[in-house]
Amino acid sequence: MAFFSRLNLQEGLQTFFVLQWIPVYIFLGAIPILLIPYFLLFSKFWPLAVLSLAWLTYDWNTHSQGGRRSAWVRNWTLWKYFRNYFPVKLVKTHDLSPKHNYIIANHPHGILSFGVFINFATEATGIARIFPSITPFVGTLERIFWIPIVREYVMSMGVCPVSSSALKYLLTQKGSGNAVVIVVGGAAEALLCRPGASTLFLKQRKGFVKMALQTGAYLVPSYSFGENEVFNQETFPEGTWLRLFQKTFQDTFKKILGLNFCTFHGRGFTRGSWGFLPFNRPITTVVGEPLPIPRIKRPNQKTVDKYHALYISALRKLFDQHKVEYGLPETQELTIT
């Protein structure tokens, strides 16, 4: 009985720490968005709002210059419960020399990119031990850093904007041994994810290759096997009113917020139930062999296309070498759109 009690407690903690992830960001984001205008206009606490905005203005460039990472935050115990929920694993195939900088391109995006977050924005899977002397940064939308409190939280985990200025700073002005992790397919790729799928939005995604050429950063392919398995995405049949409504809503959502809206679901609080918790399915992020890239200040399109093709070839090789080991059939092919 004691064993089952401990087991249930572990599962409960894992579920809680996964469940809190998105609400925490929403809550932290809502506090300044709602309270700052209220304090400014209607409250005697208006000096707090003024100080918050003054600090944001004073500290505006920090997130584009490496941020303020915290080893303490990255090592929080809650991330280990988060890791064990799926579980999430990081696999190294080749060493990364601290003499170089790297762009680690990750695929697929999935719905929420759990693999990238746990493996590179925390120490839950031991990235500092697996890749010693390498400092990882995870790229995300710059608008997140416009929100007080939230920006401090994500910066503490080594998250940075995926903007040109921020990436160039990390890859050219912060020494060597830096690795910027970018989920290249972005939100457009999230619309392609579903269990059993291995479809990437990559043919027209060449900005990361151009950035590698401009900075001389080595390109590293990585693939998170299982990322597409943790949620079911619903796409209604073409020609139905549900599909028309879904597509209209998604197009409007993207125009207003610049984001793609996915209709998805996972499990509930009990196994077998319906809800918005991800399914307990393993996610394994395999990091491949670095592809040396020459530094060219103004690469032409032909050069960008050349190294983009080399990158895709290396990614396909990585996928084919590991797909069976991590749950995909031998016949599964990587589809690139």
Curated annotation (Swiss-Prot):
GO terms for molecular function: diacylglycerol O-acyltransferase activity; O-acyltransferase activity. The keyword Thylakoid does not apply. It is found in: Endoplasmic reticulum membrane. Diglyceride acyltransferase that uses fatty acyl-CoA as substrate. Particularly active with oleate as a substrate. Has no wax synthase activity to produce wax esters. Able to use 1-monoalkylglycerol (1-MAkG) as an acyl acceptor for the synthesis of monoalkyl-monoacylglycerol (MAMAG). This is Diacylglycerol O-acyltransferase 2-like protein 6. It is a multi-pass membrane protein. Expressed in all tissues tested except pancreas. The chain crosses the membrane at residues 22-42, 102-122. The gene is DGAT2L6. The lineage of its organism: Eukaryota, Metazoa, Chordata, Craniata, Vertebrata.
